Amino acid sequence: SGGFDFSFLPQPPQEKGVGLGPGPMGLMGPRGPPGASGAPGPQGFQGPAGEPGEPGQTGPAGARGPAGPPGKGVVGPQGARGFPGTPGLPGFKGEPGAPGENGTPGQTGARGRVGAPGPAGARGSDGSVGPVGPAGPIGSAGPPGFPGAPGPKGELGPVGNTGPSGPAGPRGEQGLPGSGPVGPPGNPGANGLTGAKGAAGLPGVAGAPGLPGPRGIPGPVGARGLVGEPGPAGSKGESGGKGEPGSAGPQGPPGSSGEEGKRGPSGESGSTGPTGPPGLRGGLPGADGRAGVMGPAGRGASGPAGVRGPSGDTGRPGEPGLMGARGLPGSPGNVGPAGKEGPAGLPGIDGRPGPIGPAGARGEAGNIGFPGPKGHAGLAGNRGEQGPAGPPGFQGLPGPAGTTGEAGKPGERGIPGEFGLPGPAGPRGERGPPGESGAVGPSGAIGSRGPSGPPGPDGNKGEPGVVGAPGTAGPAGSGGLPGERGETGLRGEVGTTGRDGARGAPGAVGAPGPAGATGDRGEAGAAGPAGPAGPRGSPGERGEVGPAGPNGFAGPAGAAGQPGAKGERGTKGPKGENGIVGPTGPVGSAGPAGPNGPAGPAGSRGDGGPPGLTGFPGAAGRTGPPGPSGITGPPGPAGKEGLRGDQGPVGRGETGAGGPPGFTGEKGPSGEPGTAGPPGTAGPQGLLGAPGILGLPGSRGERGLPGVAGAVGEPGPLGIAGPPGARGDGNPGSDGPPGRGAAGAPGPHGTVGPAGKHGNRGEPGPVGSVGPVGALGPRGPSGPQGIRGLQGLPGLAGQHGDQGSPGPVGPAGPRGPAGPSGPAGKDGRTGHPGAVGPAGIRGSQGSQGPSGPAGPPGSGGGYDFGYEGDFYRA
C-alpha cells in the first residue's frame, strides 16, 4: 500500500514450529566505495528570456568616424539605342567656288562615322556637257570636318573664319553610385567657411528603358507660354486614417563580431549536497573534448578522491532562445548631414479610370455646317428618349490599294536626332515593381507667413545656465561725517578668534552672464488656420535651390493659356551662408484640418521640359463595356481639316437594323497623341450593350485633331454568347430613297469580342479625389547628400521655459574697492583684560636728592642722615 516491496531480498528458511515473530533488524553494513562517475546528463533546456534591462544612460556622442572607402562605381548597362533621327532635306547645290590657295597640308584626320543615308533622289536626265563658265564667287565655308591628329607646325597663316560647331557626341554611360557603409553620426562641428561648389555627384542608376512606342508624326512645336501667377495655397486637407503597418523590411546584414569577453570571477562555493546513492557505471568514455577552465573547489563531504574521468564531448549548440521583449525606443540621434540629391524616381502607376457620364439624347442628323470657333466644354446632358432608327446607308466603294514599297537597306547608325513627339501609347504592360523613393524635388515657393498659432505647452525644464561673471563694483557712496572721538578705553585681553560673521548685504548686481544652454524644445502647438495669401511680390533674383517642399494637392486642370514670349533669365543670386543645424525637437501633435481653400486660377502652360527617361510601362487598365453601335450614314465628301470642336456629351445610340457588310477601307493615319491626363476615379459598372451590326466604312477623311477621350468604365458582366451572323457578299445597291424604319428589337447578346487595340491616349480626365494615406512603406536607402539649401526664415519665438534650477556657486569675484567711511561708532563696551605684558626694563638709578633739614637732636650717640628725601634714624 504505497510502501517498498522487499520481497526481492533473500528470505530466511521457513521452519515449522511455533514462530516468535520477526527477529530484530540487523546492523547497517559498512559504507561502500563511491561509485564511478555517471555519464553526463542531457543538455538542459534554455531558460526563459530575462526581463529587459533598464535603459542605460545615453553615453556621450562618439567621435566622428573616419571616412569610409570611396565607393566603386559599377558601369551601368548600356542605354537603349536611340531612334534614328529624321533625315534632313537635301541641301541646295552651291555655286562652285574659286580655287583657293593651297595651304600647308596637315596629317590625315581619323575617318569620321558614316551618317545615315538620306532618301534617294529621283534620277535626273543626262544633261549635255556645256562650255566651261567663268569662275563663280567664293562659296560659303562648309561645316568643319572631324579634327585630325596634329601635323607639323607650319607657318602662321592668316586668321580664318570660325566654322560652325560639330554635332554633339553620344552621351556617355552612366555609372552606378558608390555604396559605402554609413558611419555613426559625429558631433556637429563648428561652422566652416563656405567652400566652393563641389563637382556634381555620380548620376543615379538609369531605370530600365520602356518598350518603345510607334513613332508619332512630328507636330509643330508650340510657342512657349507665359508663366502664370501662382494661385492661393489651398488649406490643408483632413488627415487620413493611420495606415496599416508596413511589412517587415529585409533582414539587415550581420553585425561585426564583438570583442572577446574577459573571464568572469569565480562563483561562490556551493553548499554540500546530500551524498547521493552510488551511480551505475557510465557508458563509453566520450572523445577528448577541449579542456574547460577549472572552477573553484567545492566543499563536499570528505570521501576518497575519485579518479578524474576524460572530458566529455563538446555539447551541441542549444536551440535558439525565445525572442526577448522589445526594447525601449532610443533617444533621437543627432541630425545627420543633409542628403545629396537622389536619382530621379520612376513614374507612378496610372490611377483608376473615372466614371462614365450619362448618355446624351440622340439628335437628328443635320446638314454639314461650317466649322465654328472652339467653345468651352459643355456639361453632359440628360439621356433622351429612344428615337426611331435611321435608314441604312449606302455601301461605299472600296478604296484603292497602296503599292508596297521595297525594303530599304539598313544604314549605319546615324547621329541621334532630336526627340520626336511622343507616339501613341502602346498596350499597357504588367504592373512594374514599386520604384524607389523619388528624388527630393525643388523647394516650393516660400508661402506667406501665417498668423501665430496658440502658444504651446511649457517646455521641459532647461538645464541650469552657466554662472555669470562677477559684476563690477558700484559707484562709491558719499562719505559719512566723522563722529566725535570717544575716550580711550582700557586695553582688554586678547580674545579668542570669533566665528565668521553673518553674510553681508548683497553687492551690486553683476553683469549678465553668458546665455545658458538652450532648454528642451517644447511640443509644437496646434497649427493655426492658414492665413490669406499675401499680394504677389516683385520677382526676386534667382537664389539657390532650397530644400524640397512637401507635395501640394493637385488642383483642377486649368485651360491652356495663350503662348507668351519667353522671359529673360534672371541673374543668379548669391549663395547664403549655412546656418547652424539646431537639435531636432519632438514631433508636435497634428493640428486640426483647416477648411478647403478656394480653387486657384488656372496656370498657364509652362515650357516643355527636356525629354525624360523612358519609364516602366504602367499597369494595364480594365477594359470598359462596349457601347452600342449606331447606324452608319452615307459617306459624305471629305471636308477640310476642321477646327477642334467642343467636347459633346457621351451618346448612347440605339441598336439599328443591320446594314449589308461593307468593304474594308484604307487605314487612316494615326492621330496626333493627346496629352496624358491624371487618372480619374473608377466609374460604376456599366451595362453590357448589345453588339451592333457592322456598318459601311466611310471614305478616308483627313487627319483630324485628337478628340477628348472619355473615361474608361468598369467592365460589365459577361453576356450570353449569341450565334454569330453570316457575312454577306452583296454588290453595291442602288441609291434608294431614305426610309425611316422603326427601331429594331435588340438582338441577342453576342459573345464578348476580342479586346480592341488601345486607342490614342485621351485628354486629361478630371482630377481624382485624394485617396487615403497609404501604408508607410519600408524606409528606402539614404540618397546621396544634396546641396545645402538657403537658410530658412527664422521661426517664431518659443515659449519661455521653466525657471532652471539654481546653478552652482561661482568662484569668488575680485575684491572690490574700499567703500566710503561709515559714521563714527558708539563707545564700545569694556574689553576683556589684556594679557599681562612682559616685565619692564629696570630703570637707571636716580640722582642724589637735596639734603634734608637738620633733624632734632639725637638721643645719645646717634646721628641723623637723609637719603633721597626720606629720614632714617640710626
UniProtKB/Swiss-Prot annotation:
Residues 237-246, 474-483, 603-612, 648-662, 725-744 have a biased composition (Gly residues). Residues 1-874 are annotated as: Disordered. Residues 566-575 have a biased composition (Basic and acidic residues). The modification Allysine is found at residue 16. The modification 5-hydroxylysine is found at residue 93. The keyword Secreted applies. Keywords: Extinct organism protein, Extracellular matrix, Glycoprotein, Hydroxylation, Pyrrolidone carboxylic acid, Secreted. Belongs to the fibrillar collagen family. This is Collagen alpha-2(I) chain. It comes from Megalonyx jeffersonii (Jefferson's ground sloth).
